[in-house]
Amino acid sequence: MESLKEMRKAQMSEGPAAILAIGTANPDNVYMQADYPDYYFKMTKSEHMTELKDKFRTLCEKSMIRKRHMCFSEEFLKANPEVCKHMGKSLNARQDIAVVETPRLGNEAAVKAIKEWGQPKSSITHLIFCSSAGVDMPGADYQLTRILGLNPSVKRMMIYQQGCYAGGTVLRLAKDLAENNKGSRVLVVCSELTAPTFRGPSPDAVDSLVGQALFADGAAALVVGADPDSSIERALYYLVSASQMLLPDSDGAIEGHIREEGLTVHLKKDVPALFSGNIDTPLVEAFKPLGISDWNSIFWIAHPGGPAILDQIEEKLGLKEDKLRASKHVMSEYGNMSSSCVLFVLDEMRSRSLQDGKSTTGEGLDWGVLFGFGPGLTVETIVLRSVPIEA
């Protein structure tokens, strides 16, 4: 029995998991938000719906978004008119592009992350791939392993259909893997596309317009490992704790269903209020062990689900205006990229901290929180420890 305990101890890391590198990628097609209402109603042959177009334009104007990236080209939409209908039978066309573009975009982000990490890709021991697009067998994890040329013995985990909160989920899982498999290095990839969800407008589904105004395509990749070798690796953030919570009275607030018409997304109006009204519970539980209760004393990596969510969180917690700056910047430049979005915010935080001459990767602060919000309603809470920025 003693030898079993010794074996178990030998498998565990000495310290917490750390994020060692970050890479991001977006499709080449760029859509300016100011022009998008005209483009969207033209491509979906819905210009006669003038009242609905006015509502959509208002949504776009209030979205905080300046531009978005999407894999769909004008040529693809013209060649696949069923995709442009509100409920056209278009799953095959959507799948044809998603099963190719999901791993391709993920690979682009992964190459950047591995390059920053600076170690051979043969040292990657585990792969976590997350997406709500292109469900297939074998999955995008298999495709990425082949495209990237990872070791065929890499231990893979494919996560489909979790939605926007999964940027926190993958970090929670990567933390567990890294800390319970000594010497492991986990490649985490989130690659999200609007291919399943793009559809034309309908007067009977105004909530669908919200997603059309916010969602975008993007991929983010991280390398996660515990006990980094300081001679060849450098931690960016330490993953101190991770938890998940279902919010009360939130059944059906955000739902997605795969149909012949693609992935239909349904949003209730009270989603921002449900998130902001319950956010203090996971926050208090996560930071109580550290004796932290001043939410302006930590740095914030919040999934920018939409402008109302960010605004109501600020108001609920009394956050200073600049606390959600990184989230708002990513929302402005990229839109809501589902699970990959919060990892873009993480990258923005470390880049901005360096550019502004801050003392740590957390805007000069030591402790921070990463929040993922999504269907359930589900909240993922990750406590982060920043690292000093070398002069």
Curated annotation (Swiss-Prot):
The active site is at 164. Keywords: Acyltransferase, Flavonoid biosynthesis, Transferase. It is an enzyme of class 2 (transferase). Its EC number is 2.3.1.159. It catalyses: N-methylanthraniloyl-CoA + 3 malonyl-CoA + 3 H(+) = 1,3-dihydroxy-N-methylacridone + 3 CO2 + 4 CoA + H2O. Belongs to the thiolase-like superfamily. Chalcone/stilbene synthases family. This is Probable acridone synthase 3. The lineage of its organism: Eukaryota, Viridiplantae, Streptophyta, Embryophyta, Tracheophyta. The gene is ACS3.
